[in-house]
Amino acid sequence: MEVDYNPMDLPVNTVYEDESEFRDLEGTDVKDMCLEAEAIVNDVLFAVGNMFVSKTLPCAVDVAYINVEIKEGTRYCLELTDAGLRVAGYAFDHLAEGLCSQYHETVYSLLDSLSPAYREAFGNALLQRLEALKRDGQS
C-alpha cells in the first residue's frame, strides 16, 4: 500500500475522530473481571478448600467465573459481574440454568453465607493478625 506521507512527519498529539468514542471512558474505572477474579481468589484462598478462576467458562471485561470448593467439601461455580458475586452453579465450570441466586457485594459476604468453616478460618486469621499487630506495637 502506498502512502503519500511519512508517518514520522505526523505530530505526536494528533487527535483522530475515531477516538471520540473512547473519550467517554476517560477518567472512569473500567474493570477487567478476569483480573478482579484473580484478586478475589488470592484474597480468600487461605480460607477455602480450593478456589480458581475458570479456564472453561468465558472470562471477559464484564463477567468472570470462579470455581470454589468450601472447606465442607461442597463445590460451587461463582459468577462475578458489576452486580457482584453469586452462585451460578453447584459444580466446577457448571452453570445451573434458571438459578436465581442472590448477588453479594463481596466475596466475604458470599462465603460467609455458604460456609461456617470459612467464617471460622477468616475469624482465626483476623485474630492472628490483630495479635501480631499488638505484639509489634509493644516492641
Curated annotation (Swiss-Prot):
InterPro entries: GSKIP, GSKIP_dom, GSKIP_dom_sf. Coiled coil: none annotated. GO terms for cellular component: cytoplasm. Its main location: cytoplasm. Signal peptide: none annotated. It comes from the Eukaryota. The keyword Ribosomal protein does not apply. Keywords: Cytoplasm. One of its GO terms (biological process) is regulation of canonical Wnt signaling pathway. Gene3D superfamilies: Hypothetical protein (hspc210) (3.30.2280.10). It holds the Pfam family GSKIP_dom. It is found in: Cytoplasm. Belongs to the GSKIP family. PANTHER family: GSK3B-INTERACTING PROTEIN. This is GSK3-beta interaction protein. The gene is gskip.
